[in-house]
Amino acid sequence: MAQEERSIIVSVIIPHHNNKQILVDCLDSLHQSTYKNFEIIVVDNASSDNSINDVRSNYPDITIIQSLKNLGYAGGCNLGAIDAKGEYLFFLNN
């Protein structure tokens, strides 16, 4: 069943600034989860290392929100929460 066809229960929101490898490890771990009723939102806090473009290419199912300035962890969480579709919000700090 496609993700759009089922009700999303959990929105996983990950504010991100540079450090591609930690983000990739986090995303790989989430994709290996047996629980599948969730969406992933990555909020890019003005990364300068081009990491978000690599993530966009390799994880097409992830929602990416790009901020032109670094909003910090709390600001990134708030920005991600605006687009979240889940009944519950789960915030990760990579």
Residue ranges of each PLM-predicted region?
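N-proximal low-complexity "stem/linker" segments adjacent to membrane-targeting elements
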Residues: 1-32
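Short aromatic/hydrophobic "clamp" motif used to bind/position activated sugar donors
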Residues: 89
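A conserved acidic beta->alpha catalytic loop
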Residues: 29, 44-52, 69
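Active-site acidic Asp-centered loop
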Residues: 45, 92-94
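Acidic helix N-cap motif at the loop->helix transition within catalytic regions
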Residues: 24, 49-57
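Glycine-rich, basic loop-to-helix element that forms the pyrophosphate-binding segment
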Residues: 67-84
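Short loop->beta transition adjacent to catalytic acidic/histidine clusters or analogous donor-positioning motifs
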Residues: 8-10, 31-42, 62-63
